[in-house]
From Swiss-Prot:
GO terms for biological process: glycine decarboxylation via glycine cleavage system. It comes from Vibrio vulnificus (strain YJ016). Pfam families: GcvP2_C, GDC-P. Gene3D superfamilies: Aspartate Aminotransferase, domain 1, Type I PLP-dependent aspartate aminotransferase-like (Major domain). This is Glycine dehydrogenase (decarboxylating). The gene is gcvP. Its EC number is 1.4.4.2. It is an enzyme of class 1 (oxidoreductase). SUPFAM superfamilies: PLP-dependent transferases.
């Protein structure tokens, strides 16, 4: 290539698009922090003993166009065939108004979990709609705002039954007609809780002494039966009964809640979310009022703001793992907010009548198929069904299945049976094609006419739904596309996302989610595949997954990866299981002590508790490092039973601990394993790696370091990497499992497969040099922010040379003592300046943790620093008595447009200071839509359903 051609090459252009500061800005920043060069800063920050000895070996960086061409080759290897497998996954139509305005819209997918409710009212409303939808369709009292997938929700239901029940039994009963992938995830969870899983016929439940049970309704083979008596008899025996159900079926069949279920779980996938070869999808859980504080996952509640107006918030947050730690109800952190929002909008768009029509059509098509088959001499396993039939095909099974495959049709292959599931996309042509496979000569129209006289004959009368659902006005207002488009925009406008400005949340890595990375997500070649389709039809997914795993191994220094875990917390769980199985394989199953530094993320102790480990806390010194003396003492005390240590690197205090290799060596010498939490991998890539440091296993947050967007609270992915000795203990899967069939942690083998292309695309476009540069720039940005703020705020922890890693902790405690202004006041005041708050009170109470990421440019960093410095000056005015402590811009923050227009302004500061405190806000202003939300009121007056219409009229 000539010199001119080389100079005009745009192959590496993406790196400059992804990283915020250009070269000139980097030089200014380096001057501000007194570093000679970027490499000099890295040398001062990252301990020499953990620096990689050679660069990562990855393919040359690709341009956006080349990357999309490469990923299209993977997509083209996938074969999208007509699929009638069912088993919890169905084709669906994603309404285009939702596809374009939500799934493909950075205003929705780049937001963070709504911990700051004043700037999250839009998606809080949508998630409240989701809860209302689930409550209505299941017939239950309260629902959460989503879980990771149906199988995980079932495992969570099991632990809820154990916590909430009065039985002393250790048995959990699972009906043998529950989806097989769900049973496997339950078995994994039960093993480490010490529960005995008994699998049997539904009718055996009342005779089984069990603390809890899981039934499937309709069953995995499609049967619809009245479970009322079975549930009542089990409950009389102190058994809490959970039921896995189908939301679309619940539009026609009697809801599980009306049959007496204590817990109802399932997946909302078929409400407009593509199958995506397994995910991501929003699961749900609903329960009775008395179990609300035992229910895992996030719950949206109705509260009031400082003016007494209705405001939404996440309720009962004290149940969450970051507060309860090893006593938490679950280790769940990431949920599936974006997918829950899509499902809730599906219900809003269609309403009761639309959902019922979709259900009627699906059922009618199934009834036509069943009638044609039975008239042609085939026997059905069940004559009562909604959308799924199972045909007793005996010795013809393999021949019929092969005939279907030859016709490019996927059916469910069972032992001597074939299953067929229909959905909203099923056509008359599909039925004709199936009739041809089974040599049925009947006419679809004639069969339809016969059935019309008794449309619901296949649903037993006791199982027919008579109650209304989706009667709230929100589900009966937005049925034209214009109405829906405006409703979606109205909600989006209430929320702060990366489209508005920096989200400097420490430990969350809110970096750019580039448009090019997102494009393949909605391609049907990735979206329309059933996770249990024959593996050869998913050759593209297999190749992409293997290539991504190889890339991740190179980046992390590990030898093997599993992509199955659907979140960081799920990855932690899979990683600790791998450690425990390894110990068991060596006859050391007694090793159950997990050492966790006091600075650790709350998920760590919560996960350790889920694997029945005894958590022993290791002290940190005054600089935030692991106290080696205390570590040595704890290792000596627990040496015989030491299983592992869980560390985060760089530490959650935002520094590179010098002695991390020594920590690993000490634990290994005592027979333990090292779990390195990958939450802060964004400060490692290309500079060091978990494998090089000496760790045995890590999860990676693909939704942090590797650019999968946070989606306003999910999806996420938490794949785990391991050294070779732990590779045999990675999660398996009953369908297409590469690592064997046991110890699954997710419903599908590749977890949320359809978002894997995002991380693959990011790595492909950055290349080894680009990824390394991103890490360096993330460190530069953090140190720049730290140095600009240090004259005004105490910085809690810094490394040996006075540097921080990719985030820094600002200590508000001494300032609160001095001025009376808290970290919460600062967080809320930042909203007036057009920012999302940093992480509050983690890992140290009374602090703010700031992580700017590499994607923010110098102008945005300065805008943030200027806002923080201005807020510090406002605090001084409170201290000096210019503004009273109980009435100032900080304690009254955030301010809304309604505040600005108040006729009576009874505050000692002008409206301009309240609403336009900086020059930047006069140019462009994001407005919170409510005043400060009253958390105490919300939890004392818990309402987790949609408010009445009068609240909207106000």
């Amino acid at each position: 290539m000539t010199e001119l051609l080389q100079s005009l090459n745009t192959q590496h252009e993406f790196v400059g698009r992804h990283n915020g500061p250009n070269h000139a800005d980097q030089q200014k920043m380096l001057s501000t922090i007194n570093a000679e060069s970027l490499d000099a800063l890295i040398a001062q920050t990252v301990p020499a003993q953990i620096r990689l000895e050679k660069p990562m070996q990855l393919a040359e960086a690709q341009s956006e166009a080349d990357m999309l061409a490469s990923i299209k080759k993977f997509a083209d290897l996938n074969q999208v065939k007509r699929t009638f497998i069912g088993q919890g996954y169905y084709n669906t139509f994603t309404p285009n108004v939702i596809l374009r305005n939500v799934l493909e819209n950075p205003g929705w997918y780049t937001a963070y979990t709504p911990y700051q409710p004043e700037i999250s009212q839009g998606r809080l409303e949508s998630l409240l709609n989701y809860q209302q939808m689930v409550m209505d369709l299941t017939g239950m009292d309260i629902a959460n705002a989503s879980l990771l997938d149906e199988a995980t929700a079932a495992a969570e239901a099991m632990t809820l039954c154990q916590r909430a029940g009065k039985s002393k039994s250790k048995v959990f009963f699972v009906a043998d007609d529950v989806h097989p992938q769900t049973i496997e995830v339950i078995k994994t969870r039960a093993k480490y809780f010490g529960f005995d899983v008994v699998i049997g016929n539904v009718d055996a439940l009342p005779q089984t002494e069990a603390f809890g049970a899981l039934l499937q309704y309709p069953s995995t083979t499609g049967e619809v039966r009245d479970l009322t008596d079975v549930i009542a008899q089990a409950q009389a025996n102190k058994t809490l009964v959970s039921v896995a159900t189908d939301l679309l079926a619940s539009a026609l069949v009697k809801p599980a809640g009306e049959m007496g279920a204590d817990v109802v779980i399932g997946s909302a996938q078929r409400f407009g979310v593509p199958m995506g070869y397994g995910g991501p999808h929003a699961a749900f859980m609903a329960t009775r009022e008395q179990h609300k504080r035992t229910m895992p996952g996030r719950v949206i509640g109705v509260s009031i703001d400082a003016k007494g107006n209705q405001a939404l918030r996440m309720a009962m947050q004290t149940r969450e793992q970051h507060i309860r730690r090893e006593k938490a109800t679950s280790n769940i952190c990431t949920a599936q907010a974006l997918l829950a929002n899509m499902a809730s909008f599906f219900a809003v768009y269609h309403g009761e009548e639309g959902i019922r029509t979709i259900a009627r059509r699906t059922h009618h098509m199934t009834a036509i198929l069943a009638a044609g088959l039975t008239k042609s001499g085939y026997e059905l396993a069940h004559n009562a069904f909604f959308d799924t039939i199972t045909i007793n095909t005996g010795d013809k099974t393999q021949a019929l299945y092969a005939k279907a495959q030859a016709a490019d049709i996927n059916l469910r292959l069972l032992d001597g049976q074939i299953g067929i599931s229909f959905d909203e996309t099923t056509t008359v042509a599909d039925i004709d094609a199936l009739f041809a496979i089974f040599d049925v000569k009947e006419s679809v129209n004639a069969l339809s006419t016969d059935i019309a006289g008794n449309e619901f004959a296949a649903i037993p009368e006791a199982c027919r739904r008579t109650s209304r659902f989706l009667s709230h006005p929100v589900f009966n207002t937005h049925h034209s596309e214009t109405q829906m488009m405006r409703y979606l925009k109205q909600l989006e406008n209430k929320d702060f996302s990366l489209t508005h400005g920096m989200i400097p949340l420490g430990s969350c890595t809110m970096k750019l989610n580039a448009a090019a990375e997102m494009i393949p997500v909605t391609w049907p070649e990735f979206g329309a595949l059933h996770p249990f389709a024959p593996i050869e039809q998913a050759a593209g997914y297999t190749a992409l997954a293997e290539d991504l795993k190889a890339k991740l191994c190179e980046i992390t220094g590990y030898d093997a990866f599993s992509l199955q875990p659907n979140s960081g917390a799920s990855g932690e769980y899979a990683g600790l299981i791998a450690i425990q199985r390894y110990h068991e394989s060596r006859g050391e199953g007694h090793r159950n002590v997990c050492l966790i530094p006091s600075s650790a993320h709350g998920t760590n102790p919560a996960t350790a508790a889920m694997v029945s480990m005894k958590v022993v806390v290791v002290k940190c010194d005054e600089n935030g490092n692991i106290d080696l003396v205390d570590l040595a003492a704890k290792i000596e005390k627990h040496q015989e039973n030491l299983s592992s240590i869980m560390i985060t690197y760089p530490s959650t205090h935002g520094v590179y601990e010098e002695q991390v290799k020594e920590v690993c060596e000490m634990v290994h010498a005592a027979g333990g394993q090292v779990y390195l939490d990958g939450a802060n991998m964004n400060a490692q890539v290309g500079l060091t790696s978990p494998g090089f440091i000496g760790s045995d296993v890590s999860h990676l947050n693909l939704h942090k370091t590797f650019c999968i967007p946070h989606g306003g609270g999910g999806p996420g992915m938490g794949p785990i990497g391991v050294k070779s000795h732990l590779a045999p203990f990675l999660p398996g899967h009953i369908e297409n499992g590469v690592e064997g069939k046991e110890f699954a942690v997710s419903a599908a083998d590749l977890g949320s497969a359809s978002i894997l292309p995002i991380s693959w695309a990011y790595i492909a476009m950055m290349g080894a040099d680009g990824l390394t540069e991103a890490t360096k720039v993330a460190i530069l940005n953090a140190n720049y922010v730290m140095e600009r703020l240090r004259p005004h705020y105490p910085v809690l922890y810094r490394g040996t040379n006075g540097r921080v890693a990719h985030e820094c902790i600002i200590d508000i405690r001494p300032l609160k003592e001095e001025t009376g202004i808290s970290e919460e006041d600062i967080a809320k005041r930042l909203m007036d300046y057009g920012f999302h708050a940093p992480t509050m009170s983690f890992p140290v109470a009374g602090t703010l943790m700031v992580e700017p990421t590499e994607s923010e440019d110098l102008e945005e960093l300065d805008r943030f620093c200027d806002a923080m410095i201005a807020i510090r000056e406002e605090m001084t005015k409170v201290k000096n008595g210019e503004w009273p402590l109980e009435n100032n811009p900080l304690v009254n923050a955030p301010h809304t447009q309604v505040d600005l227009m108040e006729e009576q302004w009874d505050r000692p500061y002008p409206r301009e200071i309240a609403c336009f405190p900086s020059a930047a806000t006069k140019r462009s202003k994001y407005w919170p839509t409510v005043n400060r939300v009253d958390n105490v009121y919300g939890d004392r007056n818990l309402v987790c359903s949609c408010p009445g219409i009068e609240n909207y009229e106000e």
